[in-house]
Regions:
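Short, solvent-exposed loop/turn segments at secondary-structure junctions
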Residues: 30, 60-62, 93-94, 146-147, ...
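Non-catalytic, usually N-terminal nucleic-acid engagement modules in DNA/RNA processing proteins
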Residues: 1-183, 296-299
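C-terminal extensions of enzymes
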Residues: 1-15, 23-32, 39-40, 143-149, ...
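Glycine- and acidic
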Residues: 147-151, 156, 216-222, 331-334
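A non-catalytic, amphipathic alpha-helix used as a structural packing/dimerization or gating element
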Residues: 126, 130, 157-168, 204, ...
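Conserved, mostly hydrophobic/aromatic
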Residues: 21, 54, 89, 131, ...
């Protein structure tokens, strides 16, 4: 159950009650594609860096180790040793982005594994069964994420099919949650809004899927090539057409600036690989912008990545030492940068929630953007 605690403008301060605990929103979900966050981050680290939700990938876990294996081992929570909420995406994005040759039919998608090339079929029912085997807290509906360069006619057909698939996802989820051997009989289902950069298609789709009374709603198919201004324009158009009393999830986004702008538009769930991916390459976030620790100017810098930061890296090590580890290709350097970045993101979400509680999100946002050397583009 989602509890809308208060609003500050369009920004939502919420709380999602789940079988695996309460999620305070707005929240950034830490991405662990194959049931682990890249960068040698263990689930035992997640508590220390303020993680509320871990996100894993249905497609990757279906291919390896196999969702049946995970089910036999008690589900993802037991498999990973993580007792807080987990969201699994449906596999749709990976099917349409990673897979080479694929055939889209009404029943689903036929494609080849990116690992060994073997043939796989995935449709709405298959995606729900896989996610039920994984026993995640929140399952995402199976959708088509069309190319950012697809024409309007194709987008319209794709969105209509995604709507039909969503109805099938809901029916299958209800069936699975009633089975005696299902691990998580309270698995939630989020639907996904699509429509490319076409506002009218997006709005019509949002209105249609809102009638299905799902546990939450996501905006998908953004951050796939369009400009930030286009993304914000779409959010301005579509978010008001999604239920206010349900979580609103912007998939795969994004930078700290993206998150601040999207919160201002009513979004309260986020995920993105940026903090871990950038960390693995020595790029770290601070309240004054991003640093590249490979830069020679940090060779003798004995300060932490950010003064006052309480992450494991900043409490114990200097920029100079972490730079040395990165240059020496020691895994510890990568790990420390990833831990710092995730802590930075999770702390920023904590600050956002505090600002919403206090009713001063607008001033917090402007100050945060100013310190990071950015400016608001709320009114693009």
């Amino acid at each position: 159950m989602y509890e809308l605690i208060k609003k500050d403008g369009l920004a939502k301060r919420g709380r999602l009650h789940t079988v695996h605990g309460v999620i305070e929103t707005p929240v950034f979900m830490n991405v662990g594609t194959a049931a682990a966050i890249k960068g040698a981050v263990a689930t035992t680290d997640l508590q220390e860096i303020k993680t509320q939700v871990e996100l894993s990938n249905t497609y990757h876990l279906h291919v390896r180790p196999g969702d049946e294996v995970v089910k036999k081992l008690g589900g993802l929570h037991k498999f990973m040793n993580w007792d807080k909420p987990i969201l699994t995406d449906s596999g749709g994005f990976q099917v349409f982005s990673l897979a080479g040759l694929r055939r889209i039919k009404e029943e689903g998608v036929y494609f080849n594994s990116h690992i060994d090339g073997h043939k796989i079929f995935m449709g709405p029912e298959e995606s729900m069964r896989i996610q039920s085997n994984l026993a995640s807290t929140i399952a995402m509906a199976f959708d088509e994420c069309p190319s950012s360069v697809a024409d309007r006619e194709y987008i319209e057909k794709s969105v209509a099919r995604t709507t039909r698939w969503l109805v099938r996802c809901k029916k299958e989820m209800e069936r699975l949650n009633s089975l005696p051997d299902t691990i998580n009989k309270h698995q939630m289902l989020f639907g996904i809004n699509q429509g490319g950069v076409y506002e009218d298609i997006r709005i019509k789709h949002a209105d249609e899927i809102s009638k299905l009374n799902l546990d939450g709603y996501a905006v998908g198919g953004l951050a796939v090539g369009e400009s930030h201004e286009e993304m914000y324009r779409i959010l301005d158009a579509v978010v008001p057409h999604l239920p206010d009393h349900k979580p609103t999830y912007l998939m795969g986004v994004g930078t700290p600036v993206n998150i601040l702008e999207a919160v201002d538009r009513g979004v309260d769930f986020f995920d993105c690989v940026y903090p871990s991916r950038n960390g693995r390459h020595g790029h770290v976030y601070t309240n004054h912008g991003k640093l590249n620790l490979f830069n020679a100017k940090f060779e003798l810098d004995d300060r932490p990545i950010e003064e006052g930061c309480q992450c494991p890296a900043c409490r114990n090590y200097s920029r100079a030492y972490i730079r040395h580890l990165l240059k020496a290709k020691e895994m510890l350097g990568m790990r420390l940068c990833v831990l710092h970045n995730l802590y930075f993101y999770n702390t920023m979400m904590e600050e956002i929630r505090d600002a919403l509680d206090a009713g001063n999100f607008a001033s917090y946002k402007e100050e945060k953007l100013y310190r990071m050397g950015q400016s608001s583009i709320k009114n693009v």
